Structures are given as structure tokens and as C-alpha cells.
From Swiss-Prot:
GO terms for cellular component: plasma membrane. Plays a role in cell envelope biogenesis, maintenance of cell envelope integrity and membrane homeostasis. The keyword Protease does not apply. Keywords: Cell inner membrane, Cell membrane, Membrane, Transmembrane, Transmembrane helix. This is Inner membrane-spanning protein YciB. The gene is yciB. Belongs to the YciB family. It holds the Pfam family IspA. It is found in: Cell inner membrane. It comes from Legionella pneumophila (strain Corby). It is a multi-pass membrane protein. The keyword Transmembrane applies.
């Protein structure tokens, strides 16, 4: 259910784009992101950092898209999120006591420090590649293709990466690792 909630602004953007175009879809995505952050805050009494991060980027780039009537700003949004995520994941390996992926997953799985750092690097590289791929699609194909890629390609590649990661993790865990759950 949380996954659907997290993708709420993207799905609305996709649907509205199909009927009304890029500018209306951008405005709706901005409102949807703001609504998402407010709803989450009311329901859970705190903010989800990723929602705030995404909201800030969509407000800046979406606002620029609407103000300048130029869709290139919104097309850069996924790349901005991917590359800033890559920077945060990479930096977490050097700042703090643990890589970010370990902080996110260690309650559910027990891995060696070496594997945590490899996994963190894998996510860093994944985000860099996804950001570059978004730009490639944005600059080499029309907006219809980019919008489809933004939803289906982004989600599809992320699910594929998580599946590959799961197979990798099975080689480096034992059944006791999952007893924490």
C-alpha cells in the first residue's frame, strides 16, 4: 500500500498528461506531491524525507516548467532525484558510521560490512545510470515516450534491480539473518 502511495503523484501525472498535456500534468503533480506530504504528516505525525525531497524538486522544476512554459525543466526532475539520491548513498559510505542502505535494511537482514558497502555502491551506480537514462530518453524521444518511460521504465528497472539485488543477497545471507523479522 505504501508503494502505491509513494507513486501517487507519478501516476496522476501520467493520467493527466494523457488527457490534458504536460503543463496541466505538471501542475497536478505539484498539488499531488503537496497533498501526499500533508496527508502523510497528518496520518503518521512526521514527514517522510523522500516525500519532502521529491516535493522540493517538483516545486522548483515544476514551477519553472509552468512559469517558462518549457517542459525541459520537468523532464530533468527524475534525473535530479536519481542523481541526488546517488550522491546521498555514496556520501553515506564516508559520512557516518554505516552506509545508508545498511541503515535502511539492517533491521531485516544481517550482512557483513563489506556486503553492505557493495550494496550501497550498487544503489549509487543504479541511481546514476537511471538519471542518465532519463536524460537519454528525454532528449532522444518525444514527450509521449518520455512520460511512458518515466512511469513504466522507471518502475520496471527499479523492480528488476531489486530482484537482482535479492538474488545477490541470498548468496550472502543465511536463514538466521531473517529471524530478526
Amino acid at each position: 500500500m505504501k508503494l502505491l502511495f509513494d507513486f501517487f503523484p507519478i501516476v496522476l501525472f501520467f493520467i493527466v498528461y494523457k488527457f490534458f498535456g504536460i503543463y496541466t500534468a505538471t501542475a497536478v503533480a505539484m498539488v499531488a506531491s503537496l497533498t501526499q506530504v500533508a496527508f502523510y504528516r497528518l496520518k503518521f505525525q512526521h514527514y517522510e524525507k523522500m516525500h519532502l525531497f521529491s516535493l522540493a524538486i517538483i516545486m522548483v522544476l515544476g514551477g519553472a516548467t509552468l512559469f517558462f512554459q518549457n517542459p525541459w525543466f520537468i523532464k530533468w526532475k527524475p534525473t535530479g532525484i536519481y542523481w541526488l539520491s546517488a550522491l546521498v548513498f555514496y556520501g553515506s559510505g564516508y559520512i557516518g558510521s554505516k552506509p545508508l542502505i545498511q541503515k535502511m535494511m539492517e533491521a531485516n537482514i544481517n550482512l557483513t560490512t563489506k556486503i553492505w558497502y557493495r550494496l550501497n555502491l550498487a544503489w549509487t551506480l543504479f541511481f546514476i545510470v537511471m538519471g542518465a537514462l532519463n536524460l537519454y530518453v528525454a532528449y532522444h524521444y518525444d514527450t509521449d515516450v518520455w512520460v511512458n518511460f518515466k512511469l513504466f521504465g522507471g518502475v520496471g528497472f527499479t523492480l528488476l534491480f531489486v530482484l537482482i539485488q535479492a538474488f545477490y543477497l541470498t548468496k550472502h545471507t543465511d536463514e538466521k539473518s531473517f529471524e530478526k523479522q
